[in-house]
Amino acid sequence: MSNTLPRFIAAVNTKGGVGKTTTTIGTALALVKLGYAVEVRDVDPQGSATSWAMQARQAGTPLPFDVRVANRMTVGEPPADPDTWVLIDTPPSQSDLIGAAVDASSLVILVSTPGRLDLERMAQTRSNIGRASSVLLTQTKQGTVSLRDAEAFLTEHRIGRFDTMIPFREGIRRATGTATMPSATGYGSVTYEILQAWGLR
């Protein structure tokens, strides 16, 4: 990828509960920690990212970036500063919203747990997008059959993934609605891989 590409990234899977919002917020926090400007756009009618931001603000520790509600018409609007990273949280359904988010993005993060149903839904989603994409495995447990099967599934279907995998951690669940993500979540490493893809590391 080129460092001249718009810095738009969408977290996508038509299966719910795989960690799209956590990935969006976790990556945004990691980018801010490295000194980058970030904006999150929430196109999910359930408003999970928006709710996260509201909870953090009510707790007195607001997120260090804006979370904007967006729709299919506004999700691709360029930020005021072209160096701003725009991370898009998408719904598990509403194909028009997912399509608009994908169309606006230079990179699609296909978020999936190692579960077979989640992987199959991810692969189906991948076949319908026309953007550079990479799978991010979440809620993983090292040494398990499910993780080995997931890696074999991706290899068999020739689907690329992030080297980093997000572990199943109680700390990640507890981070919901806060402005702090535990250091060992893996999102810092995911962010480093993203920056490498843009030629910024």
Regions found by a protein language model. Give the residues of each.
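Short, well-ordered beta-strand core segments
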Residues: V86, V108-I109, S133-V135
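Inter-motif core of Ras-like GTPase G domains
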Residues: S93-R116
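Conserved nucleotide-binding/hydrolysis micro-motifs of P-loop NTPases
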Residues: P45-G47, R116, T140-G143, E170-G171
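Beta-strand-loop-alpha "switch" segments that mediate conformational coupling across diverse proteins
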Residues: K141, E151-S183, E193-W198
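Short, well-ordered alpha-helix to beta-strand connector turns
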Residues: D83, A104-S106, R158
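Conserved C-terminal guanine-recognition region of P-loop GTPase G domains, centered on the G4
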Residues: L119-T138
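P-loop/Walker-type NTP enzyme "switch/lid" segment
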Residues: S2-V18, I25-G99, S127, P167, ...
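Short, conserved loop/helix-junction motifs that constitute active-site signature segments
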Residues: D103-A104, R126-R131, L154-E156
